[in-house]
């Protein structure tokens, strides 16, 4: 029985003698250096992630603000072109001889309005709405008046202003 015990001791002794302690210490030192590098890299990535998250928040707010501004500008331009078409239609009715060379079909076409929702909750929905087509041609006449549009069809074009106020100013004061 003494033989197997000595054989196992011999085997373990030879395995231990094969391992160089300097190599093991060098491997442990290399692993510690790599661990330090990985910890520094991880810290830098966390800082970068925090910074980029803050910048994303700032840019998202700016993008949303600019998108709302663009939607508001589109709405204003639609209103302006609608007013121009309305005025052009009124002028065409008042002075048909000046508009005789324009085909009647262009006056009768109605514009396809894309309704813009009052709230822009998401930037995706807002940007999709702002890319919708907008018919800005002044040849099309829209029969409806936009809210807040002042009807000047009853005022004579050459009517003078009295005391710095036109007739429409007086009507606004009495209408309010």
UniProtKB/Swiss-Prot annotation:
GO biological process, one term: vesicle-mediated transport
Stretches with biased composition (Polar residues): 129-145
Modification sites for N-acetylmethionine: 1
Record's subcellular location: Lysosome membrane
Keywords associated with the record: Acetylation, Lysosome, Membrane
Principal subcellular localisation of the protein: membrane
Annotated Pfam families: KxDL (PF10241)
GO cellular component, one term: BORC complex
Annotated segments matching region Disordered: 95-176
Biased composition (Low complexity): 119-128
Domain of life: Eukaryota
Subunit structure: Component of the BLOC-one-related complex (BORC) which is composed of BLOC1S1, BLOC1S2, BORCS5, BORCS6, BORCS7, BORCS8, KXD1 and SNAPIN. Associates with the BLOC-1 complex. Interacts with BLOC1S1. Interacts with DTNBP1/BLOC1S7 (via coiled-coil domain).
Function description: As part of the BORC complex may play a role in lysosomes movement and localization at the cell periphery. Associated with the cytosolic face of lysosomes, the BORC complex may recruit ARL8B and couple lysosomes to microtubule plus-end-directed kinesin motor. May be involved in the biogenesis of lysosome-related organelles such as melanosomes.
Family listed: Belongs to the KXD1 family.
Name this polypeptide is given: KxDL motif-containing protein 1
Source organism of this protein record: Homo sapiens
Organism classification: Eukaryota, Metazoa, Chordata, Craniata, Vertebrata
Gene: KXD1
